[in-house]
A protein has these predicted regions:
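Face-selective signature of the C-terminal outer-membrane beta-barrel domain
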Residues: 1-111, 123, 170-175
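Surface-exposed extracellular loop regions of Gram-negative outer-membrane beta-barrel proteins
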Residues: 34-36, 78-89, 96, 110, ...
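Small/polar-residue-rich segments within soluble enzyme cores
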Residues: 164
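Flexible glycine-/small-residue-rich
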Residues: 167
Length: 175
């Protein structure tokens, strides 16, 4: 049977301050993951032993108006993945990958009239590849498929714009 040891550590820190019409928030996040397979089980895990360190800091500023408000945010992220293992042929494989990114968002809302509210937000999102996507190499026990990762894979980035017009009168609402 496959036997894996997983240790993880997460820490979040958030600071928030209100000053008149302004609201400011800043924070950070650290995640450490260590995953190792137990030797001597007779099975070769589909992913190698790995450690992953993620860290991020962010800031958000909001300004409130009588009938609406605006907000902007910025986030800096980094991720380092170190993997080392043996594939089903007994050959060593793995490596170290580092990913960095800056993401942002800009949004606002406005009360058009009684019951009507317009909201819009635009932002850049980011996701670094998981160790499975980078270094999987072997038989996946749950599906019986042979899978192989791509250690040259880059992080994903996407833009997202959401706008909505909402009406609500207390008894009824529609978006």
């Amino acid at each position: 049977a496959v036997s894996l040891y997983l240790n993880s550590f997460q820490h979040l820190l958030r600071w928030k301050r209100d000053y008149r019409s302004w609201q400011v928030e800043a924070g950070g996040q650290v995640i450490f993951i260590e995953n190792h397979s137990r030797a001597g089980t007779g099975f070769v895990p589909v992913i190698p032993n790995y450690t992953e360190t993620q860290a991020g800091i962010y800031g958000i500023g909001k300004y409130h108006l009588a009938r609406g408000g605006v907000e902007a945010g910025l986030r800096l992220d980094m991720q380092e993945t170190r993997a080392s293992g043996y594939d089903w042929t007994g050959s060593p494989y793995g490596g170290t990958r580092k990913f960095n990114n800056v993401s942002y968002s800009l949004g606002g809302h406005y009360q058009l009239s009684k019951g009507w509210r317009l909201t819009s937000n635009f932002g850049l999102a980011w996701r670094a590849p998981h160790v499975y996507e980078l270094y999987s190499n072997g038989n996946e026990l749950g599906s019986g498929m042979f899978v192989r990762g791509d250690s040259a894979m880059h992080s994903e980035r996407s833009y997202k714009w959401i706008s909505s017009l909402r009406y609500g009168d207390g008894m009824f609402s529609v978006c």
